[in-house]
Amino acid sequence: MDFSLLKPNENFEFEKYFDAIIGAFDTVGRKVKIQKKDKKVSSKVESAFLKDNTDIYNVSFQTEKAIKIKIEVDTNPPLLFDTENKLLLQPKSFMTRCFNLSDLFAGKMHALVFRAWGDRLKGRDWFDFEWYVRNDYPLNFEHLRERIKQFNRIDMSKDEFHEKLIERLSSANIGNVKQDVYPFVKDPHVMDIWSNDYFMQLAGMIKYK
């Protein structure tokens, strides 16, 4: 689970929320342990999007088999994003503050274009890209631009980003993209249309906020 502060705070301490988290799980009969995880990076793949300012925690609890939830907290987030409050009803009614979809779209496109995994492709980025375009959500380019500045040290215009996106979409091995997604979809035939040209045409349909 990914979380972000609303503004940078190098002194943020997630530990002070532990009691509240443990108590929330306890109300539904789950005993949990929370441990801060050391950020040991053994390869460039693992470090691709792991920032120095991201704290990582493991929340573990026991069901029929042990479940572990990884929580990441970005204490130095790229700015120029908007949030909204969403009502959830389970396990009890509560409000949660979320990035809006235009900013989540921006984060997804940053990952798709700049994720430095060599020959490995995270097909779920491509699946989500298709979902945002098909559902007509606009992309907040100003937030995307901030992400690129912070992660990649580049100040990129909209046209420059589009060129970089087309380069990525045209050169990727779509077979590898599909292989990463197959375990997560009920009907693999929904990806029959996927091709380099298909995604390049989707790129031309992106609406910017």
Please annotate each region the language model reported.
Residues 1-4:
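A short glycine/small-residue-enriched secondary-structure motif
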Residues 6-209:
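Structured mid-to-C-terminal alpha-helical surface segments
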